[in-house]
Amino acid sequence: MAEQRTAEIEYADLAPMALDIAMFGEKNIDSLPWLTQPPRANISSAKDLLVSLGAIDTDNNITPLGKRIAALPCHPRMARMIVCANTAERKALACDIAALLEEKDPLADNADTDMTLRLSLLRRARGKKQIGRWQRIAKIAAEYRHMAHATEDNTDPVPTEVGLLVAYAYPERIAMANDNIGGYRLAGGGNIQLDSADSLSAHTWIAVASLYSQPGKTGRVFLAAPLN
């Protein structure tokens, strides 16, 4: 018997495609003549994400912000972060954050989740022309800067500025500390836990860029930054 292959659309992130469809004025994604119909839950998740990013309204109409997001050839989350970066410093930082999130964490063995640590090391290595393990991330960051018309910045980033930009990309992952040591409640629902020794555990508010979670269980944070 021939092996059945699962069509990519059945498991892929549909947010970029849903934004493109909204850009063309189509309001009912379900009515399109799909070769393989994407799961309704995936369509719903994509729409919910785009609404939370301010890219579309609840009727699937593209917004002015959505048009700016759609103009950038990257995931809507990263595009929103770059578009909302309203200074040259923030735009350069947004490009570095996007590159860091696109690649495997160079400090994956480090238990601390602080993104600012990674970004500082990237910038110091780049400034000294000693890229080493940061070479791939530095290259991707340069591509993002070209896309965003940003300039390279190798000053140490402000931690709360990192958090602000992460929050633009992941608004549902803004998290407030709860009564448990190192515990937080996500804006989009669900709980996450930091190690008590994590440098971010002293902050009341954080923005989470990378995590692993399952329904009904406390999520594990990999990358985050503090918020004011």
Q: Where are these predicted regions, by residue range?
A:
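Second RecA-like catalytic domain
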Residues: 1-228
